[in-house]
């Protein structure tokens, strides 16, 4: 019915980014919480969160305008999606922040490979209105397992690692507890 379709559209909008149609923060945190619960049932398995920030997005937005920035964000989302396995979850947290959940891994290697693919994809130029634009990124990786207290704690670890990557110039970093010192 029409009412049911409207309810479904409203629910979709509540949990997805309006621009990229990716899951939003609320849906991502829910998926991360469930993934962490699954690590408690699978001994030795981990989840990874990749926190990706576009290093020069503000410059693009300021010089070419918000419409061009929005188009670039859609293109970035498409490229990042192609780097993932079907079971991985990509979300946009707003602005130029993209976050990925990778489940059922043993260690950081798979997450590092995905982050390297992201980095390579974002180094390739984007063609926008006849211009070549670049969207270099900084990526932080946080690993969670049965001992991880909350999804928010794991997101904070990945975010901290991303800022460390940004400090050294557009690279990727795996979270280390020493980063909080």
Which stretches of residues belong to each language-model region?
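Sensory coupling linkers of modular signal transduction proteins
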Residues: 1-9, 180
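Conserved long alpha-helical elements within nucleotide-processing catalytic cores of c-di-GMP signaling
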Residues: 8-48, 55-85, 91-100, 106-116, ...
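Conserved catalytic/ATP-binding subdomain
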Residues: 26, 109, 133, 149-152
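Cyclic nucleotide signaling catalytic output domains
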Residues: 90, 117, 121, 127, ...
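HATPase_c (GHKL) ATP-binding subdomain of two-component histidine kinases
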Residues: 100, 135-137
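A structural signal for hydrophobic residues in beta-strands of small regulatory alpha/beta folds
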Residues: 101-102, 143
